[in-house]
Amino acid sequence: MDFLGIAGKTFLIFGVANKKSVAFSISQVLSEAGAKVVYVVQSPEIKENVSRILPGSDIYICNVEHEQEITKLAEDISRTHPRLHGIVHSIAFANYGTRLKPFHETRKNDFLQSVDISCYSLISIVNVFKDLLDKNASVVTISISTTRMAAEPYGWMAPVKAALDSTICFLAKSFSAFSQVRFNSVNASLLKTSASAGIPGYLDYYLFAEQLTLRKKALETREVANTVVFLLSDRSSGINAQGIVVDCGMSVNYFDKNIIDKTMRV
């Protein structure tokens, strides 16, 4: 029995860069369930890499900072995939550089570029692709488990993700005027990905977060992917304009007794 009911359906995924990408794990779960996956990557170099790990796949190139490229992308995809049953937006970027800076020293250009790529791109993508979306399609983006925890290494990306969380609600309301397309986010806690490796000091925070999980085992990318695919399926038809937190219980365990005991003994 196909519980998810996504076999034979077509999904567009933005953001695969390598095998450690969240988007890659999502594509694997979709493919295992019998879905058709179409990929969008940022550059020819990334396309070459993704072609090696996903041979024979439909892979398109689009730099989402340029709206004309998104428009052309939709035109190109429509020729071979005129109906999409879902879109995965797994795109984020922050120009952290090599030195961790205090939040108040955030440069305007860096902040606005992050908003453009990590948040506004979703608005632009769904607007351009709206005529290709099935009336019951699902759009899922990747956010973070909390934007209220001021973790220094993540810097201005937390406010950017907060904007993304709000954007989900407004897109859901806006699209409801002419369709039943749903918009949700999967709000994941710390993951071991290539992108996160570029965040200054990330590893220490990742290992600490692992100790805060109720199971004392870090969140796996595959677990995030499973949640995304559920939201893409009709089995989640009653969920719209929501952020589903996937953090292995970390958010209720900031006062973990073992960690407190170790800290107080120092």
Where would I find each of the regions flagged by the language model?
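Canonical Rossmann dinucleotide-binding motif of NAD(H)/NADP(H)-dependent dehydrogenases/reductases
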Residues: 3-40
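Catalytic loop of short-chain dehydrogenase/reductase
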Residues: 15-24, 92-131, 135-178, 187-192, ...
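Short, small/polar-rich loop/turn modules that mediate ligand/substrate recognition or access, typified
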Residues: 180-182, 239-241
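Conserved SDR Rossmann-fold cofactor-binding beta-strand/turn motif
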Residues: 182-192, 232, 245-247
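Short C-terminal tail/terminal secondary-structure segment
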Residues: 229, 240-266
